[in-house]
Regions:
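Hydrophobic, Leu/Ile/Phe/Ala-enriched alpha-helical segments that form helix-helix packing faces
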Residues: 33-44, 102-105, 126, 158-162, ...
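Well-ordered, non-membrane alpha-helical segments in soluble/globular domains
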Residues: 32, 94-96, 148, 152
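Non-catalytic C-terminal interaction segments of nucleic acid-processing enzymes
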Residues: 1-6, 70-73, 127-172
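Hydrophobic anchor at the start of a short beta-strand
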Residues: 44, 48-49, 109-110, 133
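Catalytic cores of nucleic-acid endonucleases
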Residues: 75-78, 83-130
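Phosphate/oxyanion-binding active-site loops and adjacent basic polyanion-contact surfaces
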Residues: 29, 60, 90-94
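Active-site metal-binding core of divalent-cation-utilizing nuclease and nuclease-like domains
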Residues: 44-74, 89
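Acidic-basic catalytic patches of nuclease active cores, encompassing PD-(D/E)XK
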Residues: 1-56
Length: 172
């Protein structure tokens, strides 16, 4: 596996902001996902907010959610924690904690993830979790692709956008 659940290589993404920058940071990734979600679902009234404080973590630290998506009428919300790892590191120890912490969140949410630095075991854990979604949009993307479909589907189920799941299928 090379960063995507289907084993395909992760597309190269170079930040617009700085031509000297060649690697995406975790903050770059969260901004990219937030921008994608905001643009993709703005016609449905969805608003995406970055770095929102919500209660405490499972170790009693103040929690800051990477992306908070609020539905059109303000009655439903969905939290997205972003994990991007482009090189081998300590992320393997952090993912089980992140999944446990997400379960303790007082609202529905998921972990959006991408990058080539996850071990095969952690990629399997994320791919198997109903609370994680591979997501790697391109800058300015507004349509669903194989690289965004998992997050699109979690948001669609939460907010009741069944047409996102059905796409162009006809009823029986």
């Amino acid at each position: 596996m090379k960063g995507r659940p289907d084993g395909q290589p992760v597309p190269t993404w170079l930040p617009e902001v700085s031509p000297q920058k060649t690697q995406m940071t975790g903050a770059d990734y969260a901004n990219l996902v937030a921008l994608y979600v905001a643009r993709r679902f703005e016609s449905r009234g969805l608003k995406a907010y970055r770095e929102v404080r919500v209660g405490k973590t499972i170790i009693a630290k103040n929690r800051c959610i990477d992306i908070l998506c609020v539905g059109e009428n303000g009655q439903k919300a969905f939290a997205i924690e972003c994990k991007f790892q482009d090189s081998q590191g300590t992320v393997d120890e952090k993912i089980p904690y992140a999944l446990d912490d997400l379960q303790a969140l007082p609202m529905t949410g998921c972990i959006a993830y991408a990058g080539v630095g996850f071990s095969a075991g952690v990629l399997h854990m994320l791919a198997a979790s109903p609370h994680a979604a591979f997501c790697l949009p391109t800058m300015g993307q507004i349509e669903s692709t194989n690289d965004t479909r998992e997050l699109d589907h979690l948001l669609a189920v939460h907010f009741g956008w069944w047409d996102v799941l059905i796409e162009r299928k006809k009823p029986v």
